[in-house]
């Protein structure tokens, strides 16, 4: 028996895998916003904060220090965690905030400075001797920011600042931030879901089915189907398991889950090949054999290994894509201290510096591997798509101003710079942002349509046939894109598709029943969607139509926009356009550059559901489309109002 990667488990289960326990302090998220704030705003869902920290107590002044400098005005924040109450009883609680704040304890609002006087509100609350969840939301317009939480304990004669000993936060949090202005709205905002914010719930053309047993809570790292219709999933958790899911289409509706293997190190890809399940774990492809046919793997055969796989929490091995006689997987870069480093453990064991952040090609018969493409950061999602080509997602970070979907080709370079120095520690001066990168198929503006894109899959039937779906771990839901090839380069448009799922989406797979199976995942901190961390569901197409943009394709003089249904009166004024570009930098993420807002210069109706828009075109720019005052011929509002087209090439007339 070849143990292979199972020996890695104790040392390589990364820090991002779900931990339990508490640490001292209150967790604080802060979003940079613009415009005048005179009431408590709501930050649009799906946007990561600009600043993320754990503070000892709520006595905060003058703003917050962040990656982009100090944030002093026009921001929205949230402090949350648990209050550790040592003495039960009746407490007086006082909240001070310039400009406004609310405090909820145990899910009930107890303080609101906007209904108090002089930026202060106080109230009485009965607190039990236990850990009590709290959520403190605040905002700052201009002036000197001040936020303070005080209490008067039973028997005290006056208020005092709630001490550090009374605050608890989740231990082992993953701190995910991003730069730039974040979107917000007020209760009086008339914009609908799907217009400047995520769509509301499940797509109208699909039915959501939750079929997992209630006590089965998988954090799914990979998913595939066996020839007999059963599903195999691997889990990114402390078990490191492979499960077989049976009865997916039984008339009784009783789904059964059986453990097939365990002890794998961060399994994040799985495929059924040559009669066995093959799994990608950290630093290895492992073939799982059930020689005695008892329903459990008894042989773990290392098929391929040897690429860097350090203990670094961010050095993953993702995916397992069979293509002909080759296998393809992706590796991410390790992170440390705010910079990206190549640091494969305590010794320089691997002489190849460009393997982290690469697509690897593996000979299936020999296990020999080589670098197929590189310049990636966190390529958590790869699959076969349009024209049978491979596409891979990548996540915003250093050198990636926002997330993107890339066309995978031999020798491709996708932008992430990694240049080790003589001691294997790259220095900022050695990182060369001028190194040209292959353009993405689509840029995915952060917090607007995606934060952490995952696995793409080709759609083979239904209204979106020929397009691609892809999931998202922290923005949540599934998005879609139409792709076209212009002058030999792939490019296209990204659209919001669905929300309403039980967790952020890590893996997608079409079942033999023609349903889309959805694997959820999540971890500590804000590396999750709405604090949900597991999920297994599926979407079934109902045949019902929903009014929305079906596709956007470029023309020599503009774009052709096609809808799923005939439209009512339509013209150039129904489209608000914004164009912008991105540029790499060594810091996390990046702003939109050269932003212009405009209306199309002309419009021509091509069919009852298609229009051609005329406008100036600039290669290397993203074009955002926003529908305004547009309804279908039946009087229906759009399901989603926005789309983003990445223009790499302009077709010849």
Where are the regions that the model predicts?
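Bacterial N-terminal signal peptides
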Residues: 10-20
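Structural beta-strand segments of beta-rich domains
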Residues: 89-91, 557-561
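Extended, polar beta-sheet/loop recognition surfaces of beta-rich domains
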Residues: 92, 632-653
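Surface-exposed, short loops/turns at beta-strand junctions within beta-sandwich domains
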Residues: 128, 616-622
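Beta-propeller domains with acidic blade repeats across secreted/periplasmic ectodomains
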Residues: 173-551, 555-558, 569
